[in-house]
Amino acid sequence: MKNKKIRENELSYLAGLWDGDGTFAIQRLKTSKTKSKRAYWVRSTFTNTNETVVKMVDSILKKMGIKKTGLRSRQRKENWKMTYEFSINRLEDNKTLLTNLIPYLNGKKATAEIVLRFVSRRLLAKKETPYNPYTLDDDLQYDQVKQMNIKGKYPDHKVVSDIARRS
């Protein structure tokens, strides 16, 4: 955490919001350049329709030192409310977010722990050599997080714990 002014209740509030309206994901990059090789990126997103809540989330993220948030707003259908979405894509920012939220997360804790291990390993790999290929562990963690994030499926907590323990 870069700024010590952040309070514990702000972190628990943010974690509760992220448990309900957020996502931690490892996504596979698909471009013409990556067809023959693996490429992944980490993305943490938060979506909400309440502008006041979104501004509060932005304030807490800035206190953490996360300034590079992609904020967009859109109205998906004419009779729907305006939706605001943050996306955090930088590995360093995701590590900061995950490290701070994991102690307070409930439903998405196992997913966040897997993503944090992935992020930590990729940051270390960047320091070791300019080109550091993805490992089988990276592939496994991508698959695990993908399964845990399937819409409409709420994985059994025992299964989630087993997945987190294996990785």
Question: Where do the language-model regions lie?
Answer:
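Internal intein/HINT superfamily modules and their associated LAGLIDADG
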Residues: 1-167
